[in-house]
Amino acid sequence: MEELLTALRAVGEPTRLRLLNVLSQGEFNVSELTQILGQSQPRVSRHLKLMAEVGLLDRHKEGSWVLFRRREGGATGALGGAIVGLLEQENAVLERDRTRLREVLETRRQAAMAYFRANAADWDRIRSL
Protein backbone atom coordinates (compact mmCIF):
# COMPACT_ATOMS: atom_id res chain seq x y z
CA MET A 1 0.00 0.00 0.00
CA GLU A 2 2.86 2.40 0.79
CA GLU A 3 4.22 2.01 -2.77
CA LEU A 4 0.91 3.17 -4.25
CA LEU A 5 0.58 6.09 -1.83
CA THR A 6 4.10 7.25 -2.70
CA ALA A 7 3.30 7.00 -6.42
CA LEU A 8 0.05 8.93 -5.95
CA ARG A 9 1.91 11.72 -4.17
CA ALA A 10 4.46 11.76 -7.00
CA VAL A 11 1.84 12.44 -9.69
CA GLY A 12 0.03 15.08 -7.66
CA GLU A 13 1.60 17.91 -9.67
CA PRO A 14 0.61 19.26 -13.12
CA THR A 15 4.00 18.80 -14.84
CA ARG A 16 4.24 15.21 -13.64
CA LEU A 17 0.74 14.46 -14.90
CA ARG A 18 1.74 15.88 -18.27
CA LEU A 19 4.92 13.79 -18.30
CA LEU A 20 2.95 10.66 -17.46
CA ASN A 21 0.55 11.42 -20.29
CA VAL A 22 3.32 12.09 -22.85
CA LEU A 23 5.34 9.05 -21.78
CA SER A 24 2.33 6.81 -22.28
CA GLN A 25 2.76 7.63 -26.01
CA GLY A 26 6.29 6.22 -26.26
CA GLU A 27 9.91 6.66 -25.24
CA PHE A 28 11.49 10.10 -25.13
CA ASN A 29 14.75 11.62 -23.94
CA VAL A 30 15.00 14.66 -21.68
CA SER A 31 15.75 17.02 -24.57
CA GLU A 32 12.61 15.91 -26.42
CA LEU A 33 10.52 16.19 -23.26
CA THR A 34 11.72 19.76 -22.66
CA GLN A 35 10.56 20.63 -26.19
CA ILE A 36 7.19 18.96 -25.68
CA LEU A 37 6.50 20.52 -22.28
CA GLY A 38 8.18 23.88 -22.96
CA GLN A 39 10.05 23.67 -19.65
CA SER A 40 13.71 23.78 -18.64
CA GLN A 41 15.96 20.73 -18.65
CA PRO A 42 16.70 20.85 -14.89
CA ARG A 43 13.00 21.02 -14.05
CA VAL A 44 12.04 18.16 -16.37
CA SER A 45 14.98 16.04 -15.16
CA ARG A 46 13.99 16.54 -11.52
CA HIS A 47 10.42 15.40 -12.20
CA LEU A 48 11.60 12.39 -14.23
CA LYS A 49 14.00 11.32 -11.48
CA LEU A 50 11.29 11.39 -8.84
CA MET A 51 8.78 9.54 -11.03
CA ALA A 52 11.32 6.85 -11.93
CA GLU A 53 12.29 6.40 -8.28
CA VAL A 54 8.70 5.65 -7.26
CA GLY A 55 8.22 3.20 -10.14
CA LEU A 56 5.94 5.18 -12.46
CA LEU A 57 8.54 5.36 -15.24
CA ASP A 58 11.10 3.05 -16.77
CA ARG A 59 14.39 4.44 -18.01
CA HIS A 60 17.10 2.87 -20.11
CA LYS A 61 20.24 3.96 -21.91
CA GLU A 62 20.50 3.79 -25.66
CA GLY A 63 23.92 4.97 -26.76
CA SER A 64 24.50 8.32 -25.09
CA TRP A 65 20.77 8.93 -24.56
CA VAL A 66 18.62 8.02 -21.56
CA LEU A 67 15.08 7.24 -22.66
CA PHE A 68 12.01 7.33 -20.41
CA ARG A 69 8.60 5.70 -20.80
CA ARG A 70 5.60 5.01 -18.58
CA ARG A 71 5.96 1.72 -16.72
CA GLU A 72 3.45 -0.86 -17.91
CA GLY A 73 3.72 -3.64 -15.31
CA GLY A 74 3.14 -3.92 -11.59
CA ALA A 75 0.96 -1.90 -9.28
CA THR A 76 2.57 1.45 -10.07
CA GLY A 77 2.35 0.74 -13.80
CA ALA A 78 -1.36 -0.01 -13.47
CA LEU A 79 -1.81 3.14 -11.40
CA GLY A 80 -0.04 5.25 -14.03
CA GLY A 81 -2.21 3.78 -16.78
CA ALA A 82 -5.38 4.43 -14.78
CA ILE A 83 -4.38 8.05 -14.12
CA VAL A 84 -3.66 8.67 -17.82
CA GLY A 85 -7.07 7.16 -18.61
CA LEU A 86 -8.74 9.65 -16.28
CA LEU A 87 -7.08 12.75 -17.75
CA GLU A 88 -9.35 15.04 -19.71
CA GLN A 89 -7.60 14.78 -23.09
CA GLU A 90 -9.46 17.79 -24.53
CA ASN A 91 -7.54 19.98 -22.09
CA ALA A 92 -5.74 22.82 -23.94
CA VAL A 93 -2.39 22.10 -22.23
CA LEU A 94 -2.52 18.40 -23.14
CA GLU A 95 -3.53 19.25 -26.70
CA ARG A 96 -0.50 21.55 -26.97
CA ASP A 97 1.69 18.73 -25.61
CA ARG A 98 0.32 16.37 -28.28
CA THR A 99 1.02 18.92 -31.03
CA ARG A 100 4.61 19.30 -29.85
CA LEU A 101 4.93 15.52 -29.47
CA ARG A 102 3.96 15.10 -33.13
CA GLU A 103 6.58 17.72 -34.06
CA VAL A 104 9.26 15.83 -32.10
CA LEU A 105 8.30 12.56 -33.81
CA GLU A 106 8.44 14.25 -37.22
CA THR A 107 11.91 15.65 -36.41
CA ARG A 108 13.02 12.12 -35.45
CA ARG A 109 11.63 10.72 -38.69
CA GLN A 110 13.39 13.34 -40.80
CA ALA A 111 16.70 12.81 -38.98
CA ALA A 112 16.47 9.05 -39.53
CA MET A 113 15.71 9.53 -43.23
CA ALA A 114 18.64 11.94 -43.63
CA TYR A 115 20.98 9.52 -41.84
CA PHE A 116 19.98 6.58 -44.01
CA ARG A 117 20.17 8.65 -47.19
CA ALA A 118 23.68 9.77 -46.27
CA ASN A 119 24.82 6.27 -45.26
CA ALA A 120 22.84 3.97 -47.58
CA ALA A 121 25.87 3.02 -49.66
CA ASP A 122 27.82 1.99 -46.55
CA TRP A 123 24.90 0.46 -44.64
CA ASP A 124 26.17 -3.15 -44.70
CA ARG A 125 29.55 -2.04 -43.37
CA ILE A 126 27.95 0.13 -40.65
CA ARG A 127 25.69 -2.72 -39.48
CA SER A 128 28.67 -5.05 -39.14
CA LEU A 129 30.46 -2.75 -36.65
Language-model segments: what does each one mean?
Residues 2-3, 74-129:
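Amphipathic alpha-helical dimerization/coiled-coil segments
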Residues 2-43, 49, 64-74:
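N-terminal helix-turn-helix DNA-binding core of bacterial DNA-binding proteins
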